[in-house]
From Swiss-Prot:
Highest rank taxon of the organism: Bacteria
Protein's name according to its UniProt entry: UPF0434 protein Atu3696
GO terms for cellular component: cytosol
Pfam families in UniProt: Trm112p
InterPro entries: Trm112-like
HAMAP family (UniProt xref): UPF0434
Lineage: Bacteria, Pseudomonadati, Pseudomonadota, Alphaproteobacteria, Hyphomicrobiales
Family listed: Belongs to the UPF0434 family.
Source organism of this protein record: Agrobacterium fabrum (strain C58 / ATCC 33970) (Agrobacterium tumefaciens (strain C58))
Amino acid sequence: MDDRMSNVDPKLLELLVCPLTKGRLSYDRTHNELISESARLAYPIRDGVPIMLISEARKIEE
């Protein structure tokens, strides 16, 4: 099974929030991640499942 999602359901994005800040997330299709701009974290999506663990998130450097 491909671990890339072709699309993230907009309703899912409305429901999910960053576990650290409780802020909104955006989908980064290039890296297949959910981005929390306020926390500067990127949460991976594996096998179509968002991994919403702070310990699994990648820090955004820019």
